[in-house]
Every structure is written in structure tokens, then in C-alpha cells.
Amino acid sequence: MVENHPFEPWLPENARLLMLGTFPPAEKRWCMPWYYPNFQNDMWRIFGIIYFQDKFHFVDVEKKTYRLDAIKKFLGEKGVAIYDTAQQVIRTKNTASDKDLQIVQPADLDGMLRQLPHCRAVLTAGQLATKVFSEHFGIKEKPEMG
């Protein structure tokens, strides 16, 4: 079954960084309806540690979710855009793993970057996101992943 991306790109006008993942996990794994929604994923905890020396800065511990308003405010202030490299996928297994995703339609990376005139850097989160981005832009030398 083909899945469409459930979220709109987050593209603040002042974005200098575009973070690209591959595709969100299945909705049953979400604790919030936005990027990096799985409570087991540490992305928002890592941001809390780096910027606030507090891994719970974006976490609502009691409700086992993330504080979405605080995340959006923070990303807007810092100039961070977020989306994924896939617009449509097929999950070959019932997992959230990139290795079990077949990309049916990649995201419109060119269109996204045109909407971000101040963007100076792109961060790809994961091997498949890196592969899709690199192939799209003809980047032959890929960074080491670990």
C-alpha cells in the first residue's frame, strides 16, 4: 500500500538549515503529529541537551509526548526547516526502519530549496535520506555513516 507523506514541509522564511529525514513512522508509533514523532526517537531530547543542557526541555514526561509548540517556536527562531526525502513510500515490512521503505515518489527537493533563499546547509538524517539527496543532486562522494 502506498503511503503519502502526512505532514507539510516546515519551511520558516529565515531557515538557514534544512533537515531531511526519509519518511515518518506509521501513525501508530506517533506521540505527536509532526516530525520525529516516535517517543523512542531521541531527536528532540538531543536538541534539548545541545541548546538547553536539558534532555527534557521539549518533553512532556507526564503525557509521554513532545512539546510541539515549543519545538516549532525553537526551530523558527533558529532558522531550521524540516521535511523528508520521500513524498510517497511503500513499507515492505511493518517497521519504521528506512531499510524497509521503498520510495515511490521522492520529495520535490528543488522546489523546497527554492522556497528557502537563506538556506546554506542541508543535514540528512540517515543513510537512505543521504542516498536520495546525493543521487538527486549528483553528489558522487558520500560521507561516511556510523
Where are each of the predicted segments found?
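Active-site and ligand/interface coordination hotspots across diverse enzymes
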Residues: 1-49, 53, 115, 120, ...
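Glycine/proline-rich loop-helix segments at beta-alpha junctions forming the active-site rim
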Residues: 2-5, 9-12, 86-146
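Hydrophobic/aromatic beta-strand patches that form the interior of the parallel beta-sheet core
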Residues: 18, 81-83, 123
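Short amphipathic alpha-helical segments, especially helix-boundary/capping motifs
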Residues: 19-23, 84-86, 107
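Gly/Ser/Thr-rich helix-start
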Residues: 22, 80, 127
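Short, electropositive, low-hydrophobicity segments enriched in small/polar residues
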Residues: 25, 83, 130
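Short, surface-exposed acidic-centric catalytic microdomains
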Residues: 32-101
